[in-house]
Amino acid sequence: MWSRSSSSKRQVATTDGDPERVLAQVQDLSDWLVANPQINGCNTFENLHFFLRTSKFDVERAKKKLKTFYQMRAERTEWFDNRDPQLPEIQDLLKLGVFLPIGPDAEQRMVVVIRTAAHDPKLHSQNNVFKTSKMILDLLLKLDPETCARGMVAILDMQGVQLGHALQMNPKLIKRSVESWTAYPCQPKLLEFTNAPRHVNFFLNTFRIFMTPKIRSRLFVRREGTSVSCDQLPKELGGQGLSYMELSVKWKQLVEENADFYVEQDKYKSKLK
């Protein structure tokens, strides 16, 4: 539960045009979660305000997002259970840097690089790759909700992709992956595949099947480079920011320092029948 503290009012006043109305909307969401304990969502001001902002301050839309998000976390146990940063399989993928937040683009949206071929498909399961990626994404939402609320720009770097990587992504897993994008409160505004091999569209067509028309319209493929304008682009993408290795070290440390955060987050999943 939360209260209408002065800090909450200050937080709302800095981002929203009608603070009192927004506070009332957050209270509505809080009361709704209490009345629907099976959803078992995080009932803090910060969390509810984030869902409200990313729903364009539509309370009913925010309720649907909350319900979908916490149901996904309950159903996808392979991604959201036992998220100990010290697990060997998680450590390996953190070191490799499979999911690297970069910073805001020119439109102040959060840019992330997803390195689709950083892992060895003979050693690392795709579910563990997704698990590690979502651990970092969840922490990113906590550390920089302001930028994330404006949307996510994902650069999917396919450098080094091999047949083994494609074979890991069966249609069932692709469907679940796409569904998870839309279940998160922060929506992808751009999905740009770069360093893509010639046959990539055959692979991406399976993704497109499960995408909504809106998400499908935001997917682009490049042979090299990126169209994203971001001062912090990594060197590997032609920018002046930290390298993939430096970003991997940074986010590995952040995840390890926030181990308690994952224990707390584990409490919030819908109660499945």
Swiss-Prot record:
<comment type="function">
    <text>Retinoid-binding protein which shows highest affinity for all-trans retinol. Can also bind all-trans forms of retinoic acid and retinal, but has lower affinity for cis form retinoids. Required in retinal pigment cells for rhodopsin biosynthesis.</text>
</comment>
<dbReference type="InterPro" id="IPR001251">
    <property type="entry name" value="CRAL-TRIO_dom"/>
</dbReference>
<keyword id="KW-0844">Vision</keyword>
<dbReference type="GO" id="GO:0019841">
    <property type="term" value="F:retinol binding"/>
</dbReference>
<dbReference type="GO" id="GO:0016918">
    <property type="term" value="F:retinal binding"/>
</dbReference>
<dbReference type="Pfam" id="PF00650">
    <property type="entry name" value="CRAL_TRIO"/>
</dbReference>
<dbReference type="InterPro" id="IPR036865">
    <property type="entry name" value="CRAL-TRIO_dom_sf"/>
</dbReference>
<protein>
    <recommendedName>
        <fullName>Retinol-binding protein pinta</fullName>
    </recommendedName>
</protein>
<dbReference type="InterPro" id="IPR036273">
    <property type="entry name" value="CRAL/TRIO_N_dom_sf"/>
</dbReference>
<keyword id="KW-0845">Vitamin A</keyword>
<dbReference type="GO" id="GO:0007601">
    <property type="term" value="P:visual perception"/>
</dbReference>
<dbReference type="GO" id="GO:1902936">
    <property type="term" value="F:phosphatidylinositol bisphosphate binding"/>
</dbReference>
<dbReference type="GO" id="GO:0005501">
    <property type="term" value="F:retinoid binding"/>
</dbReference>
<dbReference type="GO" id="GO:0016063">
    <property type="term" value="P:rhodopsin biosynthetic process"/>
</dbReference>
<keyword id="KW-0683">Retinol-binding</keyword>
<dbReference type="GO" id="GO:0007602">
    <property type="term" value="P:phototransduction"/>
</dbReference>
<feature type="domain" description="CRAL-TRIO">
    <location>
        <begin position="86"/>
        <end position="245"/>
    </location>
</feature>
<keyword id="KW-0716">Sensory transduction</keyword>
